[in-house]
UniProtKB/Swiss-Prot annotation:
Catalytic activity from the UniProt record: 5-[(5-phospho-1-deoxy-D-ribulos-1-ylimino)methylamino]-1-(5-phospho-beta-D-ribosyl)imidazole-4-carboxamide + L-glutamine = D-erythro-1-(imidazol-4-yl)glycerol 3-phosphate + 5-amino-1-(5-phospho-beta-D-ribosyl)imidazole-4-carboxamide + L-glutamate + H(+); L-glutamine + H2O = L-glutamate + NH4(+)
Pathway the protein acts in: Amino-acid biosynthesis; L-histidine biosynthesis; L-histidine from 5-phospho-alpha-D-ribose 1-diphosphate: step 5/9
Protein name: Imidazole glycerol phosphate synthase subunit HisH
The keyword tRNA-binding appears for this protein: no
Family annotation (CDD domains): GATase1_IGP_Synthase (cd01748)
Organism expressing this protein natively: Haemophilus influenzae (strain 86-028NP)
Gene designation: hisH
This protein's GO CC annotations: cytoplasm
Active site residues per record: 78 (nucleophile), 178, 180
InterPro entries named among the record's database cross-references: Class_I_gatase-like, GATASE, Imidazole-glycPsynth_HisH
Length: 199
């Protein structure tokens, strides 16, 4: 059985992420224990709230260096994906610098912010997270900040402007949407992370 650990970032959506894995039949544990995090097979970095509050929590829990040195697969969700980049304009805070890119506020194009609801996702590179998921499938988003498309983007979406819906580099993967709120496609993505992403 794969040992899946949800990193306790002190944010609000930890239990909903855990329930999503429970529904798929996977055992998960929410923790900020450094030894449990280091020994996990796969890790989830969830996030809801602001980048500066999340980085403060990670610093207080001595998790920043631990996360930066992980060699097993890590999936960042929503703010968790944004924390994987170099810097967030939200609070003007340096983030984990796991994947190049910056997180910026979505520009005003007349659409309401935050983006809240279903949006189409276009895969631009092969990625095991999306195995069996149809191109241009819909996923559920809630966000006002986003990562511009770059060389690490594996999927993009559009909300007035294009942005990275998913990024990946080495063992680090991130999705801007909430798979735990994205129905069968989100469930399949989480299953793919457990069963298809190598470790």
């Amino acid at each position: 059985m794969t040992n899946i650990t949800i990193i306790d970032t002190g944010c609000a959506n930890l239990s909903s992420v855990k329930f999503a894995f429970d529904r798929l039949g996977y055992n998960t544990e929410i923790t900020f224990d450094l030894n449990k995090i280091k020994s996990a097979d796969k890790l989830i970095l969830p996030g809801v709230g602001t980048a500066n509050a999340a980085m403060y929590n990670l610093q207080e829990r001595q998790l920043i260096e631990t996360i930066q040195n992980l060699t097993q697969p890590v999936l960042g969700i929503c703010l968790g994906m944004q924390l994987m980049t170099e810097f967030s304009e939200e609070g003007n805070v340096p983030t984990l610098n796991l994947i190049s890119g910056k997180t910026n506020r979505i520009p005003d194009t007349g659409l309401p912010l935050p983006q809240m609801g279903w949006n189409r996702v276009q895969f631009v590179k092969n990625c095991p997270l999306f195995d069996g998921i149809v191109q241009n499938s819909h996923f559920y988003f809630v966000h006002s900040y986003a990562v511009s498309p770059n060389e690490h983007s594996v999927a993009i979406s559009n909300y007035g402007v294009n942005f990275s819906a998913a990024i990946a580099k080495e063992n680090f993967y991130g999705v801007q949407f909430h798979p735990e709120r994205s129905g069968k496609n989100g469930a399949l993505l989480l299953k793919n992370f457990v069963e298809k992403v190598p470790f």
